[in-house]
């Protein structure tokens, strides 16, 4: 049985690490532009549970996944293979 490396992008949502092309900050002008394009193309996936979008994950299928986790946090999770849920980043209030 093969084992897939996954990334918890918040609130129990996961993405296969092998499918990630890049992770970008959500507040840049170019990020907002590609976000709007993805929304109009029906290729936008919102994994924020209504929280502020802090990063955008671009996949090899040209889907964009919105995450409430910071780029740095997602990068650390990939590097350390840690997919635990940090309560300070996922405040459910």
From Swiss-Prot:
Domain of life: Bacteria
A Pfam entry, by short name: RemA-like
PANTHER family, alphabetized: REGULATORY PROTEIN SSL2874-RELATED, REGULATORY PROTEIN TM_1690-RELATED
NCBIfam families: PRK04323.1
Family of this protein: Belongs to the RemA family.
Protein's UniProt name: Putative regulatory protein LA_2599
Phylogenetic placement of the source organism: Bacteria, Pseudomonadati, Spirochaetota, Spirochaetia, Leptospirales
